[in-house]
Amino acid sequence: MPTINQLIRKGRLGLTHKKKVPALGKSNPQRRGVCTKVYTTTPRKPNSALRKVARVKISGYGEVTAYIPGEGHNLQEHSVVLIRGGRVKDLPGVRYHIIRGALDLRGVQNRKKARSKYGVKKSG
């Protein structure tokens, strides 16, 4: 136990909070990366599906797992993608989303509603 004098000199260390999206750093809302693996995985109980995810290599950080939203995609190994924060609740370890319609990932085909979230231009 420290003495009063030691506390006056040094003080106590405050708690450091763990970042929810460490790969984005302090000031980046998005970051670019290269896909190293594109695959499907199954969600936690009680859900059942084949969720599309990709391992993305970010320069200056390492590899993260990112979710590919929407129906259908054209991603493959070495595709360049833009990732944003945002976890997928039923996929453990997936804390990032890939942005549709940016860089190598096309927008969702035949999407009419919520187009801005899936990178689809207005038609007609």
From Swiss-Prot:
Top-rank taxon of the source lineage equals Bacteria
Concerning InterPro entries, the annotation shows: NA-bd_OB-fold, Ribosomal_uS12, Ribosomal_uS12_bac
- Could you list this entry's UniProt keywords, alphabetically sorted: Methylation, Ribonucleoprotein, Ribosomal protein, RNA-binding, rRNA-binding, tRNA-binding
GO CC list? small ribosomal subunit
Q: Which GO terms describe its biological process?
A: translation
- PROSITE patterns in UniProt: RIBOSOMAL_S12
Sorted alphabetically, which CDD domains does this protein's record hold?
Ribosomal_S12 (cd03368)
Residues passing through the membrane, by range? none
- 3-methylthioaspartic acid occurs at 90
Q: Which GO terms describe its molecular function?
A: rRNA binding; structural constituent of ribosome; tRNA binding
**Sorted alphabetically, which PANTHER family does this protein's record hold?**
30S RIBOSOMAL PROTEIN S12 FAMILY MEMBER
Q: What is this protein called?
A: Small ribosomal subunit protein uS12
Source species: Wolbachia sp. subsp. Drosophila simulans (strain wRi)
